[in-house]
């Protein structure tokens, strides 16, 4: 009986989505810094967070190849995606902390640039967790 219960519990918890290591509620509040440039709109067109269109829609960003969603990205971000960059919580946090430095390191190109000038000094983990929660994706 104990063994059956352990198996059932293991299957239950392994089936649940695992979100980024951050605080979802804090991420929702911190996203206010992002919404001047970004929105969150589901694939079905549901507006989760009304925001700007200077940056790409961040719905489903975690798990997506960089530079591939419908948006005019900079050449270096597209090149990073073509080189295999797929957003997860860790590289998302590193990117939003210093987009230009991230791309320069990822591409090993000291001249790489990002169209995103804003640097998020803290709260990236929380924002990643929030984005994962509203997109139904895991990190």
Swiss-Prot record:
Residues reported in the UniProt entry to bind heme c: 34, 37-38, 116
Entry superkingdom: Bacteria
Signal peptide residue numbers: 1-20
MF GO annotations: electron transfer activity; heme binding; metal ion binding
Keywords associated with the record: Electron transport, Heme, Iron, Metal-binding, Signal, Transport
Modifications the protein undergoes after translation, according to the UniProt entry: Binds 1 heme c group covalently per subunit.
Entry similarity comment: Belongs to the cytochrome c family.
Name of the protein in question: Cytochrome c-551
Organism: Roseobacter denitrificans (strain ATCC 33942 / OCh 114) (Erythrobacter sp. (strain OCh 114))
Lineage: Bacteria, Pseudomonadati, Pseudomonadota, Alphaproteobacteria, Rhodobacterales
């Amino acid at each position: 009986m104990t063994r059956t219960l352990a198996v059932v519990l293991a299957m239950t918890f392994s089936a649940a989505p695992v979100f980024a290591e951050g605080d979802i509620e804090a991420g929702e509040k911190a996203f206010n810094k992002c919404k001047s440039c970004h929105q969150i709109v589901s694939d079905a067109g549901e507006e989760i967070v009304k925001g700007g269109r200077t940056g790409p829609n961040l719905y489903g960003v975690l798990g997506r190849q960089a530079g591939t969603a419908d948006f005019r990205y900079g050449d270096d971000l597209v090149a990073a995606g073509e080189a295999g960059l797929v957003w997860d919580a860790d590289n998302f946090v590193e990117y939003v902390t210093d987009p230009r430095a991230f791309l320069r390191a990822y591409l090993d190109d000291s001249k790489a640039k990002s169209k995103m000038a804003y640097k998020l000094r803290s709260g990236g983990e929380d924002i990643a967790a929030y984005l994962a929660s509203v997109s139904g994706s895991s990190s």
